[in-house]
Amino acid sequence: MAHPKRKISKTRRDKRRTHYKAVASQFVECSNCSAPVLLHIVCPECGHYRGKLAIEKALAV
């Protein structure tokens, strides 16, 4: 197996890892039903996307 030739300092290691970070999901409000929805995703509550009906939702009886 490969072995490092030199010790990598904590600073150098951490500088390499600066791009690995957690990013929070962006939520927006649905323009039709005001439910929180992920960006660029059809609303799971009403089926609308950008003001148009994208998915026919079955009515709950």
Swiss-Prot record:
Family according to the record: Belongs to the bacterial ribosomal protein bL32 family.
InterPro entries registered for this protein in UniProt: Ribosomal_bL32, Ribosomal_bL32_bact, Ribosomal_zn-bd
Record protein name field: Large ribosomal subunit protein bL32
HAMAP family for the chain: Ribosomal_bL32
Domain of life (superkingdom): Bacteria
Molecular functions (GO terms): structural constituent of ribosome
NCBIfam families, alphabetized: rpmF_bact
An example Gene Ontology CC term for this record: large ribosomal subunit
Gene: rpmF
Keywords, comma-separated and alphabetical: Ribonucleoprotein, Ribosomal protein
Bilayer-crossing regions: none
Gene Ontology process terms (BP): translation
Keyword Ribosomal protein attached: yes
